[in-house]
Amino acid sequence: NPDIDKIISYAPELLITQSPIANKDTVRLSEAGISLLTLPAPSSLEELYDNYAALADIFAGSIEGNSLAENTLADMKSAVNEAKNSCESIVFIMNIDGDEITAGTGDSFAGDLFSVFGRNIAENDTDYTTTAEELIKADPQYIFLARPLSASDFDSGLAEQLSAFSEDHVFSIDASLTERPTARLAETIRSVSEVMTGTNAETTEFTGGYAEIHETSGQ
């Protein structure tokens, strides 16, 4: 939760947050002369774009702001267009607990992001939840894991039924890259796409049937 006392001590004109602020704290901020802008946490790339546009509008005005937002997001949108159809099907998994799998579902930012590359097999699931049965049935071409999750966390019986394991199409990636969506996502999108298309093998190191995507110096 935001430290309201510390924020008030800094005396900003405007507080921008994606975290809910309690009513009593909203009153305190107002009494201190601090305006409050709450932006929704994006659940899709389009909503992320909208947040940038809203911020640009506030600080630069509607006309100049639209241009500023487009310039800021140009590289990300270019990376998205370049990455489309990098694979046939994909899934991003954050946790495994028996048959229950936490994944980037269609109603999440992570799910929408990975849908850029190909069909997200969890796109029709919600609340970050899918199952081992659904995973086996869909048999995604590529599986991405949120570190520290690795191939060894998969039950051997489950892994044997997924072609991504036998074809070395299992990769791990820093989950914070999808949890804190920023314009730097362009680098992540390109790295993931290059791994699947084989255009930058230096970003990966295969170990035990899967590979870790190394962060670039710009991330």
Residue spans of the language-model regions?
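Second-shell loop/turn segments in exported
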Residues: P12-L15, L37-P42, A54-S67, D97-G104, ...
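Conserved beta-strand termini and adjacent loop/short-helix elements that scaffold enzyme active sites
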Residues: L39, I93, N124, I173-A175, ...
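Structured C-terminal subdomain patch of bacterial secreted/periplasmic proteins
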Residues: E47-F59, N66, E70, A83, ...
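Basic- and aromatic-lined ligand-binding clefts that recognize polyanionic substrates
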Residues: I63-F117, G209-Q219
